[in-house]
Amino acid sequence: MLSIRTVLGPLATILLTVLGPFGAHGSGLADKVIWAVNAGGESHVDVHGIHYRKDPLEGRVGRASDYGMKLPILRSNPEDQVLYQTERYNEDSFGYDIPIKEEGEYVLVLKFAEVYFAQSQQKVFDVRVNGHTVVKDLDIFDRVGHSTAHDEIIPISIKKGKLSVQGEVSTFTGKLSVEFVKGYYDNPKVCALFIMKGTADDVPMLQPHPGLEKKEEEEEEEEEEGSTSKKQINKNRVQSGPRTPNPYASDNSSLMFPILVAFGVFIPTLFCLCRL
């Protein structure tokens, strides 16, 4: 009779082979994250295993707000809504310094949700990374609406002492400076942020937003309709009716008539004079 160990040994090997990648993916994602902060809030471990530390700017720069704690956040996992419900803002520009020891490919993820204003053009600001503007005129409400999660995903490359982001290059000295820049409308803010090794494809996506997807589809349809109408207008312009006659062509014949009359009078007159 086969022993239990003999039977279960190969079975365990098969299970580890099949399930191993799934477990490795979850832990692998958290291992790629080198720095994460829950801005304006306490420490938190999300559903992907990413450990967000308590905000290091507490009591130093800006103000923490938990105003969003009373609101459900769309597009976010229920367990991770706290990452969008708390925030840090400041009446002037502010930011975080992130130490990076190794060169390579990185992704900076910035998390936002508008939990106060209920219309666009109320809070608009920029985001800079080491002096490079990576997000211009961010209007969270205009992007996704009220109490809805929004992530900005920014790939970064650090090689041979140079930082490359969105086509711009600068010298890198081991510190990534993420700055939220005050604009003309209210104060800059952030709900949470992290940086990880890898590419944008490695970043977990937010849940779909039916209303947002419908809006994007409508905008795409409008762009296509606009392009089609322009082509039709151009086509109609090519065949817009018969050509207008050239007015100068008729003027040539009218000029020739007096000349011919003059010749007709001059020749008989000359003939008569010669006979005299």
UniProtKB/Swiss-Prot annotation:
<dbReference type="GO" id="GO:0006487">
    <property type="term" value="P:protein N-linked glycosylation"/>
</dbReference>
<feature type="compositionally biased region" description="Polar residues">
    <location>
        <begin position="229"/>
        <end position="247"/>
    </location>
</feature>
<protein>
    <recommendedName>
        <fullName>Malectin-A</fullName>
    </recommendedName>
</protein>
<dbReference type="GO" id="GO:0030246">
    <property type="term" value="F:carbohydrate binding"/>
</dbReference>
<feature type="binding site">
    <location>
        <position position="186"/>
    </location>
    <ligand>
        <name>a carbohydrate</name>
    </ligand>
</feature>
<keyword id="KW-0732">Signal</keyword>
<keyword id="KW-0119">Carbohydrate metabolism</keyword>
<comment type="similarity">
    <text>Belongs to the malectin family.</text>
</comment>
<feature type="topological domain" description="Cytoplasmic">
    <location>
        <begin position="275"/>
        <end position="276"/>
    </location>
</feature>
<keyword id="KW-0325">Glycoprotein</keyword>
<feature type="topological domain" description="Lumenal">
    <location>
        <begin position="27"/>
        <end position="253"/>
    </location>
</feature>
<dbReference type="GO" id="GO:0005783">
    <property type="term" value="C:endoplasmic reticulum"/>
</dbReference>
<comment type="function">
    <text>Carbohydrate-binding protein with a strong ligand preference for Glc2-N-glycan. May play a role in the early steps of protein N-glycosylation. Can bind di- or higher oligomers but not monomers of glucose, including maltose, maltotriose, maltotetraose, maltoheptaose, nigerose, kojibose, cellobiose and isomaltose, although based on their subcellular locations, these are unlikely to all be physiological ligands.</text>
</comment>
<keyword id="KW-0812">Transmembrane</keyword>
<feature type="compositionally biased region" description="Acidic residues">
    <location>
        <begin position="216"/>
        <end position="226"/>
    </location>
</feature>
<keyword id="KW-1133">Transmembrane helix</keyword>
<feature type="signal peptide">
    <location>
        <begin position="1"/>
        <end position="26"/>
    </location>
</feature>
<feature type="region of interest" description="Disordered">
    <location>
        <begin position="204"/>
        <end position="247"/>
    </location>
</feature>
<keyword id="KW-0472">Membrane</keyword>
<keyword id="KW-0256">Endoplasmic reticulum</keyword>
<feature type="binding site">
    <location>
        <position position="116"/>
    </location>
    <ligand>
        <name>a carbohydrate</name>
    </ligand>
</feature>
<dbReference type="InterPro" id="IPR039155">
    <property type="entry name" value="MLEC"/>
</dbReference>
<dbReference type="InterPro" id="IPR021720">
    <property type="entry name" value="Malectin_dom"/>
</dbReference>
<feature type="binding site">
    <location>
        <position position="67"/>
    </location>
    <ligand>
        <name>a carbohydrate</name>
    </ligand>
</feature>
<feature type="binding site">
    <location>
        <position position="89"/>
    </location>
    <ligand>
        <name>a carbohydrate</name>
    </ligand>
</feature>
<feature type="transmembrane region" description="Helical">
    <location>
        <begin position="254"/>
        <end position="274"/>
    </location>
</feature>
<dbReference type="GO" id="GO:0016020">
    <property type="term" value="C:membrane"/>
</dbReference>
<feature type="binding site">
    <location>
        <position position="117"/>
    </location>
    <ligand>
        <name>a carbohydrate</name>
    </ligand>
</feature>
<feature type="glycosylation site" description="N-linked (GlcNAc...) asparagine">
    <location>
        <position position="252"/>
    </location>
</feature>
<dbReference type="GO" id="GO:0005789">
    <property type="term" value="C:endoplasmic reticulum membrane"/>
</dbReference>
<dbReference type="Pfam" id="PF11721">
    <property type="entry name" value="Malectin"/>
</dbReference>
